[in-house]
Amino acid sequence: MTTLVTGATGHLGANLVRALLARGEKVRAFIRRQSDVAALDGLAVERAYGDLRDRRSIRDALEGVERLYHTAAFVSIRDGDRQELFDVNVVGTRMLMQEARRAGVRRVVHTSSFGAVGINPQGASNEHWTVSPFEPGTDYERTKAVSEHDVILEAVRGLDVTIVNPAAIVGPWDFRPSLVGRTILDFAHGRMRAFVPGAFDFVPMRDVVAVELLAMDKGIRGERYLVTGEHCTIGQILQWLEELTGHPRPRLAIPPRLMQGIALLKDPLERRFFPRRTPRFNYHSIRLLNSGKRGDSSRSRRELGLVPTSTRAAFADAVAWFRERGMI
């Protein structure tokens, strides 16, 4: 039985591939030719080269596949990436799901995002809270929300697919690194001079991998499962990083409203004069940190059997891995 993993060189994909190999599964990785494949070095993984924007390469990669984990996505808060976000996250996912159904793939797990989950003003959001593509938000959030509609449409047409919605993932094997990984490295190297107070859900990588595997085995077709970890304040995370890295945390807290005002001025200037620069933040990211958004993973615990682990331990795992790689 062959299991195909898209996004196998990414943070989640690298961890998921290792978990699948540990279970004795035959793994095929769907990767772009220009991708850095360090995450797969030394692993007994078949490589299928292609692109989510190329239907023919998708079709070839799915040949003989019984299980599919779709973890690939383009993640960016840069305005200049709007078209690529749509092409990869929406059109690419649509073609992959269509071809998976036509190829007779038995089971699919689609990795969406907590960004595609709506805000519950009364408390924690569960699987029933959705995001409209017309709401204020990042283009990434919009594309992940729209792509879920395509996934559910294919489920209606007969594809046995389940959706997983992780929050901000923390953990090892972060080769690129991820946004959370870059934040850890910035902290460890003293590049973080100040911070914006706020809070968000941070989830251990081991929990996300567990839900991916459990969703494949037990998930209901066309349904979502949240895995959102702990709701952590930025101050709490900075304290953990100070303890884990030995580097003092920044003490200067910039008021969120002030940073939102700065972002309203910065974002259009960046869009106009530096369209290819990757911003550290924008208006919507600051807004999200102070939106009160939090997730409810009780369905994953109740129906799939998830046993949540410590988010602080996940940060410790990430720091230890970066140290082993000589990056800290």
From Swiss-Prot:
Its EC number is 1.1.1.270, 1.1.1.417. It catalyses: a 3beta-hydroxy-4alpha-methylsteroid-4beta-carboxylate + NAD(+) = a 4alpha-methyl-3-oxosteroid + CO2 + NADH; a 3beta-hydroxy-4alpha-methylsteroid-4beta-carboxylate + NADP(+) = a 4alpha-methyl-3-oxosteroid + CO2 + NADPH; 4beta-carboxy-4alpha-methyl-5alpha-cholesta-8,24-dien-3beta-ol + NAD(+) = 3-dehydro-4alpha-methylzymosterol + CO2 + NADH; 4beta-carboxy-4alpha-methyl-5alpha-cholesta-8,24-dien-3beta-ol + NADP(+) = 3-dehydro-4alpha-methylzymosterol + CO2 + NADPH. GO terms for biological process: sterol biosynthetic process. The keyword NADP applies. It comes from the Bacteria. CDD domains: AR_FR_like_1_SDR_e. Keywords: Lipid biosynthesis, Lipid metabolism, NAD, NADP, Oxidoreductase, Steroid biosynthesis, Steroid metabolism, Sterol biosynthesis, Sterol metabolism. InterPro entries: Epimerase_deHydtase, NAD(P)-bd_dom_sf, NAD(P)-dependent_oxidoreduct. GO terms for molecular function: aldehyde dehydrogenase (NAD+) activity. GO terms for cellular component: cytoplasm. It holds the Pfam family Epimerase. Pathway: Steroid biosynthesis; sterol biosynthesis. Participates in the biosynthesis of bacterial sterols. Belongs to the NAD(P)-dependent epimerase/dehydratase family. This is Sterol demethylase protein B. It comes from Methylococcus capsulatus (strain ATCC 33009 / NCIMB 11132 / Bath).
